[in-house]
Amino acid sequence: MKVALVYNEKVETLAVVKALEKLLDSRKIEIDPENPDVVITIGGDGTLISGFHKYQNLVDQIRFIGVHTGHLGFYTDWRNFEIGKMVDNLTKKQPSSASYPLLELIITTGSGEKKKLLALNEATIKRVSKTLKADVYIRDQFFESFKGDGLCVSTPTGSTAYSKSLGGAVIHPRLKALQMTEIASINNRVFRTLSSPIVIAPDEWITIKPESDDHYVVTYDGYEFNHKHIKKIEYRISQHVIRFDKYQHTHFWNRVEDAFIGQPKNK
C-alpha cells in the first residue's frame, strides 16, 4: 500500500504528521505523493477538500481517509490521538467503502470555450460589483429569472456548509441530488424567483445564463474562476465520485448534531 499525506501548517497538525510518518514507516507503508493508493489528510474538512483538488485527476483510483486535529468533521473519521489505531487498521483490517457524489460544472464563455470543473462541496456564481441577473433552467426548461447577489449549487455533503448558511436543507450524502440556494434574491415584477432552495434529481441538471456580458466570479470549494464573458454554466452530478475507506462508523446525523446542536449526551 502506498499513501500520500496532505496537511495544513498548524503547529498541532505538524506534530501529528511527524508521529504518523513514524508509524507508517514502522509498518513498512510507503509514502508516495505521486501515485498513492490512499490519501490521508490531517487537519480538518478544509484540508480534505484541498486534498481532493490536489488529487482529483486520480479520484477514480484512490481512496481518502481524514484525520481531524480538532472536533470530528463531516469528512474526517479519525481524531489526532487515534492515528495508532488507524495505522493498525490500515495493515490488518479490510475497510468498508463510502462514496459521495461530486458536482460537475461546465462553464461556456462568450467565445464558445468550455471549462470543466469539479467540486466536492459547492459552487457559486456572483457578479463582481453589481447585482447578478440570470435566467435559470432545469433540464433545459426555463424555471425562473433571478436577481440578487448570487446563486449556490451544492452536493449533499456540501449541504452542511455554505448552503446551510443560506437556508438550504441538510441532505444525507447517500442521496445523489443537487441543491440550489439563492444568495439575497430581489423579487419584483420583472424578476420573480421561488425564494426557496430547490433539490433536483440525479438525472437532472441546472443551467444558469447570466443576462449580460460582465465580470463574473465562479467559486468552487473556495477556489475562484474569474471571467468577463460567461455565456452559461451547467451544473450536474458528476460521473466521478469521491471514495473513503471506512474502518469505524459515525452516523451522519450524529455528526450533524455534534456540529450544530451539541445536546448533552445523557438525553
UniProtKB/Swiss-Prot annotation:
Signal peptide: none annotated. One of its GO terms (cellular component) is cytoplasm. Keywords: ATP-binding, Cytoplasm, Kinase, NAD, NADP, Nucleotide-binding, Transferase. Its main location: cytoplasm. It comes from the Bacteria. It is an enzyme of class 2 (transferase). Belongs to the NAD kinase family. The keyword Glycoprotein does not apply. InterPro entries: ATP-NAD_kinase_N, ATP-NAD_kinase_PpnK-typ_C, NAD/diacylglycerol_kinase_sf, NADK. The active site is at D45 (proton acceptor). It is found in: Cytoplasm. Involved in the regulation of the intracellular balance of NAD and NADP, and is a key enzyme in the biosynthesis of NADP. Catalyzes specifically the phosphorylation on 2'-hydroxyl of the adenosine moiety of NAD to yield NADP. One of its GO terms (molecular function) is ATP binding. PANTHER family: NAD KINASE. NAD(+) binds at D45, G46, N121, E122, K147, D149, T160, A161, Y162, S163, K164, S165, A184. This is NAD kinase.
